[in-house]
Curated annotation (Swiss-Prot):
Monomer. It comes from Dictyostelium discoideum (Social amoeba). Residues 458-480 are annotated as: Disordered. This is Alanine--tRNA ligase, mitochondrial. Pfam families: tRNA-synt_2c (PF01411), tRNA_SAD (PF07973). SUPFAM superfamilies: Class II aaRS and biotin synthetases (SSF55681), Putative anticodon-binding domain of alanyl-tRNA synthetase (AlaRS) (SSF101353), ThrRS/AlaRS common domain (SSF55186), Translation proteins (SSF50447). Catalyzes the attachment of alanine to tRNA(Ala) in a two-step reaction: alanine is first activated by ATP to form Ala-AMP and then transferred to the acceptor end of tRNA(Ala). Also edits incorrectly charged tRNA(Ala) via its editing domain. One of its GO terms (cellular component) is mitochondrion. One of its GO terms (molecular function) is zinc ion binding.
Amino acid sequence: MIRSSIKNKITTTKSLSCISLINRQYGTSTKEVRETFLNYFEKNGHKRLPSGSLLPYNDNSLLFTNAGMVQFKNQFTGNEESKYKKVTTSQKCVRAGGKHNDLDNVGYTARHHTFFEMLGNFSFGGYNHFKRDSIQHAWDLLTKEYGLPKERLAISVLEGDEESAEIWRNQIGLPNDKIMYKGREDNFWSMGDGPGPCGPCSEIFWDHGKEVDGERYLEIWNLVFMQYNKSGKEGDEMPVDKLPIPCVDTGMGLERMASVLQGKFTNYDIDLFQNLINSFKEIVTMDVGRAQFQLQQDPQRVETAYRVIADHLRSISFLISDGVIPFNIGRGYVLRKIIRRALSYGKILGFNGPFLSTLFPLLEREMGDIYPQLIERSNEIRNVILNEEGTFYNAIQRGIPYLEEFVQQNKLNEESLFLLYNTYGLPLEMSQVKAKQNNIEIDMDKVNKLIDETREQSRLTWNTSSSSSDQTTQQTTQLPEKTFLSWKSDNIKPKFIGYNGCVENDNSKVLRSHFDNDSHLVYLSLDETPFYGTSGGQVGDVGELINVSSGKNVYRVINTIKPYEGGLVLVVEWDPSQQLASQVYQDLKQDSLLNCRVDRSIRNQVAVHHSATHLLHAALRNVIGKSVVQAGSLVGSESLRFDFTHGQKLTPNQIEQIEQWVNDAIAKDIALNTDEIPYEQASKNSDTLQLFSEKYSELVRVVSIPGFSKELCGGTHVERSSSIHQFKIISESSVAAGTRRIEAVAGLAATNFFKNHYQLVHQLSNSINSPIVNFQQSFERLVNTNSKQEKEIFDLKLKIAQLSSVNYNGQYKSDNGGEMIPLSLHIIDCEDKKAFTKVTENFAKEFSSSPIQLTISKGGKVLCQLLSSSSSSSSSLSADTVLKQLFKSIGMGKGGGNKLMANASIQPLNNEILNSILNWSNVNNNYNNKKN
């Protein structure tokens, strides 16, 4: 029996030498490994379920799904009952960012990935004996289905878990020298540091054999026996309670298992990765210049680059397909970081421009049959990648001159690295390499701290700016989270009865109530209610409650929320000037009977905007293409907001087509259909739109407008399309790279929109003394007249500026060896920005023989601009540097720019300031001896 930690023995090997353990090229393909696993458990009574989204549903504790059990978290905790007692899945996982972050290791180790698939089987009380059955299943699959030699397998158990050890020894027949004991750090699993299900685990290892140099054992499967509930805090020695029903959670890395079955020592040598990498190599070597460049690089560095790009292309594509868009915070920031890391490694292969988007079809070909959303969202994925590539290379082009300047001035430090990253978007890796090349030490912890502080501030600002809500649902008080957790634990799940136009219900019973006297709010859960809770982008209902017994006190429902899955809570406001707290308590306490009255007019307008949102979504996909994916929405009574993936601003013609498409559907007076069908059935219909970031129940509601739209939706809608009346887009804008936003109005809100605009046009017509029918012609005449007058004024300003100009020939003394460079100095009397810019352009042409052109206005608000000719005798000459030298000499100035142009301001000119400028410019003649 082995009772040592063997921490150094049982690890993922770091060696890159490939030893053929099973003498075949690939043998079992990765697809066959996946299918064999799922099919085995299906044959043994498990329900095969699709992979969950990479975006954990309603779980802010995780950036991304990083394990197979994430989508079953509520079943493990007991907060949700599973329809199936035994389940098997192949789960998409991403580990990049947050606690589980493999990003920096990817490409350098044998098995680290940002994206991988986790094969798993799960039992929620479905096994006769949870340990015995799960161990037997694992052994049979490995030795009989996969055909692995028994003598090449070893296992570990938790020290003290003799029950598991006995099963391996007596039931499976594993010899003692193959059973290894490990501590809680390695063989006890929990969902986190806080309360939750947990238990010992048994890991299964593939033995590479003693002849392998370096580490010997590779973990291929982890069997977790969740039999306890941890109710203590972090640091507790042992769990305190047994779960009423022990569960099983197992995880096997697909790529890792494929490497064993294919006799490969690293995951990157399996068929899936080699197919991608070899295709990449063909593309790279098609360009002679790139091929020659690659031959000059370190071969190991080149191979690492191929691995990084192959891995990152997978995580990038799957994240985008699940709705993540590159952004500056949160999940979008991680995606952006992965894309930029891949592009940085592309430079090693000779790529100096976008290339990732052209590689995506290779992944689509390799994995599209298993994950059809790669095919369905192909255009969107490629467009998002291409847009981000453009952003990246623009950032490099913008930031490199500043990086070079910081190096030349010995100012490359933590603050300047942060500035280059935060202001100009230059990747940290590029600045780090430059620092290393110049023997400059950088404290990256300090840089990362600056980034984290800025990101947190951005997150707070973003949360504030993106949390706009309908006026009927504004909630400014702190919600009683502990109360809601208690209600959730007590399984308080009200029944919603508000479909089919139902807005009233008598004798609803109060199941739970929470009184907040400070805010004069009461939170109620009723047994059944017509009030719809905020979800799916739709705002919650408002209305009134009346106590059945008293029949007189009316309470205003200001919001309806869903604080937990299955929960439905009415937020009720009471007026202390009109109602006594004791009476409120008596009327709304537990077991009270209430008459519910939803505000019908607001409900109807919300329904109008929700149905209009479905038509808008369909119209976008019809006009722009199937690559459009919903990225967010807000449906209120006054308007709707719809965010969608698209890399370009919509043209006026596209907006007009979208509006016309929606209004045509409205005019056809189509009856809406709602059906409840199994999710499995709905998900197989490619015409039915769904959000991959949403978690759907076994039974889903399908809302369809025949011939136009079909979506999974739990919201309220109109009965016929004609009830929407009319639809109008009021704005289209960008909310992030690759994400656009449309704001629109429908129904009564659209009528009011047109009414208000008519009144505005009427007022404007009166102000220019024109009949409203002739307003357009009158307005155009007014605009034309104004344009002519503005041009005349501009020409006069330009003429005055040119006539007043005082021009000097001077010299600039550079820092580089004191070289004297010709300089033209121009003093003008011009405060108009447009005229000032035009004058400087004229000077640049007229005095082109001088590499440096310096123009300064002298009156009022001062503008200073520096133009630097590209024909300069000094390649290191920078307009920004020249300007800063001027500031230093005259003791004032604020501004900056780049190598070719810089803008600034100083104090209004007087003789003293002017003479200081002339002295710095090495001009011999003074102000009175000007040279025109």
